[in-house]
């Protein structure tokens, strides 16, 4: 089949949705499909190249406690129609379909089978409340709906009720399994790792307070902070004024370096305060065999099993974080058991498994539409049969 993956965020700028799109693109191609990525332009990414098609220009805006993107173009309709007429997609797969405005324009003009994946989770959303009546017409054009977690499904279903298939995010298991620890930090001092954008919803201030409590108790440990963002200056000031000498800010790192850091860590901590639909970083930790301490929030409960792969702590609870981290620091055998349990569990989140589930869902939707005589005019591929079995190279964990 010819498949278009539509992302409202400027590809390949790093982010959870774009990471998802990237690996889904690669693995759908491995499974024999002809795939394109439809995105916007921004900065140095201005023109289409290879399988990446750019329409309009992306602008950064605050969204859900982080930064999002809206895409604008004075020639949207004609640009989109030209692309759709040229590419003849059988399936268009929209990621965050209601982020303005690229996905909405493509969806309105699509004559393909339209599938959407909902990635986000939030509490009350004024924008969605105001827009749901307008967007309901676009939602009616979706033939299939995927949510990356029960939390994401619950959030989307509040505004656009319907049938959702939960298919989780994936992780490149092999990259983290094969990574080599960084010798610089293999000096006998336990390493606690944080990876995330330095913004309010990721909860770094709570981890810094917890780490201060740990150090005041006399426990030896090092905190490695990966990421950048609006809270970086405040976080650095806190570390300096409290004399936390064993905290290192590493900024943004490459994918390869990130995998090495997960392999270097003795404990991974994700103290998110909420509004997380899933937690890909939790999968990355499990793939590396690193035990987890994380917030007890909706988006994380479907990934980490309490007491199996890690310990869950109420959000905003620095003392609880300190207690959980201290428990793992004091018990190497418990860390080893949780790390092994994580490596076992993460197999079901490998991109081979996830892509096979997505492909199977495409087939389910297409067969249902065909049986109802409602296949869109743009679909011209053979009707998929029963899904192929999932085969995973457990040693390599590819891709």
Predicted features along the sequence, with ranges:
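N-terminal strand-loop element at the rim of the active site
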Residues: 7-13, 21, 25-74
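Carbohydrate-associated surface elements
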Residues: 41, 151, 170
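Acidic anion/phosphate-binding donor-loop and adjacent secondary structure
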Residues: 47, 126, 154, 171-188
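Conserved donor-binding/catalytic core segment of Leloir-type glycosyltransferases
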Residues: 183-212, 224
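Nucleotide-activated donor-binding/catalytic signature segment of Leloir-type glycosyltransferases, i.e.
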Residues: 236-256
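Acidic donor-binding loop of glycosyltransferase active sites
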Residues: 263-277, 290
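Short hydrophobic beta-strand element within catalytic cores of glycosyltransferases
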Residues: 291-294, 304
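Conserved acidic donor-binding segment of nucleotide-sugar-dependent glycosyltransferases
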Residues: 306-307, 311-318, 327-333
